Amino acid sequence: MSRPLRLEFLDALYHVTSRGDRREDIYHDDDDRQTWLNVLARVCKRCNWSVQAYCMMDNHYHLLVQTPDANLSAGMRQLNGVYTQLANPTHGRVGHVFQGRFKAILVDEDNYLVRSPI
C-alpha cells in the first residue's frame, strides 16, 4: 500500500522534525552539525525556503520553515538525502541515517511553538 500524498501549500509555515534511524545520533561531532547546516543552506537557496528557527539535537532536529513554493517534500528529500550521502562515508556507514519519513505540522496559530515541547 502506498503512502498518502502530503498536502503542501504556498507560503506555508511548517514545524518539521526528523529523527535518526533506530533513534541513533544523526550528528557525531561539530563537523557533522556544520555539514548539515551547509546542506540546509543549499536547500533553502534551491527551494526558496526561509528557516525561521531550528534546533539540532543529537538524534533529531526541528525546523520551522516557510515554503513560498509549496515544495516541502522535495526540499526534505534533498536535505535528508544529501546529508545521508555525505555523513555515511565519513563514519564508515551505509544505509539509512534517518528513521522513516519526516514529520511536518502546518503552523496556523501564533502561539503554536510556545505550546510545543522540545
Regions of interest found by a model, annotated:
Residues M1-I118:
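Short catalytic/metal-binding and nucleic-acid-binding patches
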